[in-house]
Structures are given as C-alpha cells and as structure tokens.
Amino acid sequence: MKLPIYLDYSATTPVDPRVAQKMADCLLVDGNFGNPASRSHVFGWKAEEAVENGRRQVAELINADPREIVWTSGATESDNLAIKGVAHFYQSKGKHIITSKIEHKAVLDTARQLEREGFEVTYLEPGEDGIVTPAQVEAVLRDDTILVSLMHVNNEVGSINDIAAIGELTRSRGVLFHVDAAQSAGKVEIDLQKLKVDLMSFSAHKAYGPKGIGALYVSRKPRVRLEAIIHGGGHERGMRSGTLPTHQIVGMGEAFAIAKQEMAAENQRIKALSDRFFKQVSDLEELYVNGSQTARVPHNLNLSFNYVEGESLLMSLKDIAVSSGSACTSASLEPSYVLRALGRNDELAHSSIRFSFGRFTTEEEVDYAAQKVCEAVNKLRELSPLWDMYKDGVDISKIEWAAH
C-alpha cells in the first residue's frame, strides 16, 4: 500500500489510464491534433469525427440525443451558461428563480449575480437530510418563475434529490428545470428520455476524465433557448464559442463510456468499501452522519466527530487526503454553509470530515484510514477539556462562557 492515501474523490478524480491513452493520441504531430472547425482538410475532419464520437459517448451515458450536448470548460461554466442563459433569454416572461441554500458555489454565486441584475431568487432550505422536496418547490413556484436550479447529488454530504418528481412538477407548470449533475454522472443512473429536465451540467474530472472540460445538456424537445455568455466563432451552435479541445473531449467521452459500462458493479464495490469503513469507526462515541442515511451515494461519507476540531483531525491524518466540512483551508473560519443549512450547530459543522471513495480505493486503504481516524479522534479527545466535561455529564450548551 502506498502512502499518502487519497480519499477525496468528491474533489477530483485521477484520470483513468484508458482515458489518458485516448487523449494522448490527439496531441502530437502524428496524432489527431487538427482543429475540429477546419472544414477544408482531413486533419479537421478527423478531429471533428473524434469530437462527435465524444459527444455521442456523453449522450449515451445519460440517454440523450448527441445534438443536446454542448461542450464547456467544466460544470462551473455549464451552470453559468444554463442559469444566466435562461435568465437573459426568458426575462420578458419573468424574473423569479428558485434554488437551494446547499447548491455548489457555481450556482449560488451565479444566482447572486442575477440578483444584482434585478432578478429575484428564492433559496430553499433543505431538510436535515440534505434533500429538497417537490412540495417545497411547489410552495414557492409563482407565475413569474422562469427557472428552478437544483443539484442531483450534493457534493459535501452525498444526498440525492428526487429530480424525477421535481421535474414532473416544473414541467406541468411550464417552468424550466436545471440540474447540476457534476456529482451524480457515473454514480447514479440518469435517463433524460424519462426525466423532465431541461438543462443538466456535467464535469469530466469528477468521473475519471480530465479537468477543464464539461458539458451542458440542453433539451431539444421541448426546445430550450439560451443566450450565450461566451461569444466568438459561433462554435456549438452559437451557444459556446471557442476552439474545441479535441483531446479533452475525447477524454470526457471515454470516461463517460467507461462509467456506463462499469457503474453498476463499481457502485456495489464502493458501497462495500464505504460500509466497511463506517463499521470500523462507528464505535466512536458522539459520531454523526451528515446528510441522508438512505437517499445517498455510497461514494461520499460525511461524518462529524463531536468535541474534535475538523482542522486538528485533518492535521492528525497527515497521510490521508480528506476534506474538512469547515472551510478553514480557504482562509475562513466559517463552518460549512451546507452543514449549517442542514441545521448542524457550529460545533458539529466544524468537526466534520468528508471521506470520499473511488475507483482506485482498496480495502487495505480503507482499513488503514479507519484505524488512523479512530486513533486520532481518541487522542484529540484526550486533550480536550470539553470532552472531559461532556464525560462528566456537564451540559456544555448551557455554559455561559466569559468574554475575554
């Protein structure tokens, strides 16, 4: 077993070797390096063929028409294009948008920008399981609502929204529905022939493809119109200009093709690993699972270890790569906005760690990580006066701390 161990697959995944090989064939002078927009010679034609093959592979994973796939630089751009594109195109119909408080920043910051432009945004608060219900959406739909934007799988806690039911609701009311599927593609089955979803964002690097490439599904029936946010040579039917990066697209296509073949078996393997890890740490006292216990992807396990600082635990796990629910790493001491929205208090939010498992995780790594977590939590609690007080039966929430 090699150290350090990577258990942060929700942040990014390594590129699958099969994907890297396909990408390498599109870079050098004796490879498929042409510009897909070059219409007058074989180098361009070959590149265009590779791009269209990648488009078909992405469409096949989600059961869409390849013509509904628009290439972007990643899920952040896809979210921006979907939300701003709809808002600007349909603003004469209304200026009200619905989203939730636990979306990715790519959605939340885009919504904030639209608020500055005069749009009105309703931010729904999920239940403590991290799920937004169709009833919640229905309660805030208005005649001037033009878009609902909700994630499929939450990136911090792994809970799965019922996008099928929400889609039925939005379609019946004539409201467009955008879904951020960055964390669900390749993990949860997506069938866009059945789902009433108008726009869906995808990322390659969350599914063993390269960084810097993503896609936006834009429904043709019913047809969705977007106003472009990047202008130029009119690539991607004018929705997203810029020379297409053949090697990236080939990589994303291959990654999605592999996901389609291996998803069912891989999900079972990951669930076994996640259960194995949880079983070994579940003897720890004051351990809380964040997010839904049932509607969740097995790849993500977000745990709060009460009376332990998330940052201290991260530092103690020096040869295990995980991420903390509190964003101290990004120079702020604010606890995770997602966990706060789920109703977790600051202490539990600050003591959370996200473990995420993936294609190259082994049983040996999981066992090692679980052992190290138990050792670190017990050691840190031994040093904690709050833990001593809790063990002595003192209700810490009732203590009035003196200001200093």
Curated annotation (Swiss-Prot):
PANTHER family: CYSTEINE DESULFURASE, CYSTEINE DESULFURYLASE FAMILY MEMBER. [2Fe-2S] cluster binds at residue 328. The modification N6-(pyridoxal phosphate)lysine is found at residue 206. This is Cysteine desulfurase IscS. Pathway: Cofactor biosynthesis; iron-sulfur cluster biosynthesis. Its EC number is 2.8.1.7. GO terms for cellular component: L-cysteine desulfurase complex. Master enzyme that delivers sulfur to a number of partners involved in Fe-S cluster assembly, tRNA modification or cofactor biosynthesis. Catalyzes the removal of elemental sulfur atoms from cysteine to produce alanine. Functions as a sulfur delivery protein for Fe-S cluster synthesis onto IscU, an Fe-S scaffold assembly protein, as well as other S acceptor proteins. The gene is iscS. InterPro entries: Aminotrans_V_dom, Aminotrans_V_PyrdxlP_BS, Cys_deSase_IscS, Cysteine_dSase, PyrdxlP-dep_Trfase, PyrdxlP-dep_Trfase_major, PyrdxlP-dep_Trfase_small. It catalyses: (sulfur carrier)-H + L-cysteine = (sulfur carrier)-SH + L-alanine. The keyword Metal-binding applies. Keywords: 2Fe-2S, Cytoplasm, Iron, Iron-sulfur, Metal-binding, Pyridoxal phosphate, Transferase. GO terms for molecular function: 2 iron, 2 sulfur cluster binding; cysteine desulfurase activity; metal ion binding; pyridoxal phosphate binding. One of its GO terms (biological process) is [2Fe-2S] cluster assembly.
